[in-house]
């Protein structure tokens, strides 16, 4: 039920969009002059494709405790409560850069705004299950899955950074 609740909020509706998080990306794209069709039909970067394949494999082939640990830590990456000493989670830090360096407002970057807040709830959503079930001999593999997921996330982010460096100014 918790997984379905999480996916419902990401794909269907939550406090930030009546149409799911893709709608937030489309709205944010308008702020930078990207049309909805360009977003929907975008060819993924190789690093993005590899990361999505890795996460897909993790969630379909690994034991559920490892899958859950691997996916939960991606929510932690956006949790301002956990990363306040670093300036906040990934979405908050990116939003601050967009606002400071390019003059955007929170309203113009709804995907970043939503993820700077929604992922706090998502960070907590599965912890009781991990605390109960990722114990004993299941603890170390769950921790390793979380570490692997962080590596996948770093690869994904690096791919975006490399692509951004190629954009002519």
Label the predicted regions:
Residues 1-169:
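Non-heme di-metal
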